[in-house]
Every structure is written in structure tokens, then in C-alpha cells.
């Protein structure tokens, strides 16, 4: 149950300002680490600002959702929601300058398949990236290297409560206890659209799954010109608790505002920021512990040396071919 979950205790926050502080702190910690390494100066223009990191996170989160939407075999919505939540949680406390979101997003999807028991083999998973066996092998190698890091950074809190189950529950409840609405299924399509849009915002980190699901249904009803206040007051028994009803309505309004004010990253801005990001991950600046460790094994002859062609980094272009 959500109310007894690690999600409620550790991953549901009080405000957007709190989320912004956590992200700014992750940005600051990386800057301090890079400066302490003697590789850059404190005000080096190579660094990304917190709002620039957020733009890149938005971009790669959208890429994650696109990847999941065309995945073969079809990926259940619960798996997609779990992967999305992992990605959001990871970059609350980590910087894209240290851990590249391109591989983190795939690792989130890979781990979500396991946790939600979506039976996909490793070759099947990377087979969704591109046809080149070398590209698939390289991607899988990186995913497996980052999987434990991801689990650790999630504090081993791997169970995610998504809004999809309560959403179906509310539809069943409407069919059973709210005869005023003859066909609740007419709300599904627009409500699904709302859930897809709100998944791109921080709502999953701020509100409960049932609040998100109920807001999706009521927003759909509102767009269809259907008034459902009596459902809240009668069926959900909020008539006698006006304070609770008022709070719920305020929460719903806040969620709708999140969706309205969401701005997708502009392609020209993303292109510039990706260049800065690649500079952060270049050999002379990269502080990625996993990369260093792998290089150390190679130096100690634990890992066979690879040809220059095999060492080429897996890139965004490899993902484009799968979409």
C-alpha cells in the first residue's frame, strides 16, 4: 500500500522548491568534486547550470518514454511509469555532468522490467536499440555496469506505486456507484492523455498515485462538460469534511497547473547543452567512477584490450534508429 511505502516516506516531497534545492545541491556537489580534482576552475564555463541540467533531464526523460512506447514486446504502462520514476529520483541527487542520462535512462528501463516482472531477456532488451550486434553489446555492457549504481542511488527503494492501478479502480467505482455517469469509459482517452502529460512533470514526486489518477478523471470529465462534484461529495464521502474536499480541489488545481506550465525542451537549446554535456564527459574532465574502474581493470590486464573501433562510445544516434 502506498501509505506504508518507501515512496511515501522517502520519495514524496512537499514542494517544487524542495525539488529545486535538491537538484541545485547535486549540481554544486559535482562542481566541488571537479574543482577539487584540479581539472577545472570554479567558474569554468564547461559547467552546466541547474536549469540547464533540468532541460537535459526533460529531453532524456522524453526519449525514455519514446523508447518505451515502441518497445517490442509491448511494455506495460506500470513498467514505463516505474522507469520514469527511477529516472526522476536518480537525478534529484546526481548530476548529468557525472552520470550521462543517455545510459541512465536505459538502465532505468532495464531495471524496471525486472522489478515489475516484465519478462524480457537482455538480448531482447538491447535488440530494441539498433540492429548492429556491436552496438547492442556495447549498450548492454554499459547498462549492466550502471545497474548496481542505480539501485544504490535509489536507496534500494525499487517498488513504485503508479497512478494506473488507482485510475482503473476509480473507473470501476464510477461504473458501480455513480449511475449519473452512464458510460465512464468515455473519460478514458482524455484521462490517459492527461496521465501521459503529467508523467513529464514532477507530479510523481509531489502527489499520491490516487490523487494523480482522480485528477486525470476529473480533468477528463471537465473537458467533456461533465460535472462530477457530487461524486466527490457523495461517493467519496467528502460532503461532511469540507476541509478535506477543499484541500483535494487545491491539489487537483496545482496538478493541472503543472501540466499547463510544462515547457518541452527546445531542440536548438538541447543541441547546445548536449555539446556542453559531452565536454563534461570527455576524458580530461570525466569523474565517472565506473568508467575509471573499468579503465583500471584494463590497465591491470583483467579486461582484454579493445580495438579503437570497439571502444567507441554508444551515442544518441544509436537510439534514434530504434524510434
From Swiss-Prot:
Residues bearing PTM Phosphoserine: 5, 132, 322
Biased composition regions of type Acidic residues, renumbered to the chain: 312-323
Top-level division of the source organism's lineage: Eukaryota
Annotated GO MF terms: cyclin-dependent protein serine/threonine kinase regulator activity
Pfam families recorded: Cyclin_C_2 (PF16899), Cyclin_N (PF00134)
Family (UniProt): Belongs to the cyclin family. Cyclin C subfamily.
Record function comment: Regulates CDK7, the catalytic subunit of the CDK-activating kinase (CAK) enzymatic complex. CAK activates the cyclin-associated kinases CDK1, CDK2, CDK4 and CDK6 by threonine phosphorylation. CAK complexed to the core-TFIIH basal transcription factor activates RNA polymerase II by serine phosphorylation of the repetitive C-terminal domain (CTD) of its large subunit (POLR2A), allowing its escape from the promoter and elongation of the transcripts. Involved in cell cycle control and in RNA transcription by RNA polymerase II. Its expression and activity are constant throughout the cell cycle.
Protein name: Cyclin-H
